[in-house]
């Protein structure tokens, strides 16, 4: 029996207005519909994104596009680098969780 290709889900997260780490985590919490107990730090982000990535592996793969990231990168500096590392870690471990960057 031939394997059928799963449809892809997509999500776009606009980071163009993000100027602080707190605003970044608030934007992520809203975009991904994280639970109320999301504590707005990198460990919590990794845990919540891993949960989403596992679901993407079991159901439809997910492509997340971060729009306006250049402004957030300038505003957040090394905090943005740490945020991006978390995303890279999750997407490397779960190939059905794809991250794209759009200026």
Language-model regions: role of each:
Residues 2-103:
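Positively charged, polar, low-complexity stretches
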